[in-house]
Amino acid sequence: MRATLAGLTLSLFFAAVTTSAQESAQPGSATNSPDYSAVNCSGFVSDKVPDDIRVISGEQSNLKITFSHGDYVYINRGRDKGVQVGDRFSVVRPDKDPLEVPWFKWQNKLIKAMGQFYADAGQVRVVNVQPNVSIAQVAFSCGYMQRGDIVRPYVERPSPPFKDASAFDHFAPVSGKRVAMIVTAMDNTQLYGKNSRVYVNLGSNQSVRIGDYFRIFRYQGTLAETAPQTKNYQYELYGFGSAHAKYTWKDLPREVIGEGIVINEGPNASTVLITHSSLEVYAGDYVELE
């Protein structure tokens, strides 16, 4: 069952990667830090953002369902609100899993506690201003834009430096710092690897800052996943041997499987770019601040 679910999720994951940011080479991108697309197309979790400015339509609206790089869209702000030619805006939309099928026991509860999830649609630049509306061209695209998307003043996002990848410690001791979980990720996927952008339930209110690193780990013998698991498989497996005594997840070493860097932060959640993974990472895996 788990393999089937993982396969389906992996297909969705690669589809999302294919349709993500059209412009990967941008000013400021470098091999020693996340590139422009990784930072600006990562999505975020925060309190509800102002939503009074919207994409209301665009050119060829009788033909176009969505808008993408180079298209012209119309926003409901014009000269009367101080909009000027050259103004740049970010375009986002609320993001919610339409299925709401939990991958692990506490997933839906944690999602609600973290805040409002937003997907990055891209950026637009104003090219023409009229009294009550403006025309803007899609200058950078993370995917597609659609009528009703939220338009916000553009704020540059920092690209924090990577640490030395060779410093990863597969047997790292417990840091003693805050522990959380990978709750979900972009496009509501549940299976991740290197360069995936995931959401964890610690944010600025818990002293998380952009550039911090999270270590990813899991325990043996946990039964929190929705997918069926065999009870006590960590120390006994019928027909293939058993330990001499019972060992729960508390009795066995944790398994460190990766790490990632914080590229966006909200009050109670952070967006983390996975920089190293020794095997598949799942929603429900644990993280700790390094």
For the regions a language model picked out, list residue spans one by one.
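Positively charged n-region of N-terminal signal peptides that target proteins for export
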Residues: M1-L5
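Bacterial N-terminal signal peptides
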Residues: G7-A16
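Short linear sequence motifs
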Residues: A6-G7, S29
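Surface-exposed, polar/charged interaction patches used for macromolecular assembly or partner binding
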Residues: T19-E290
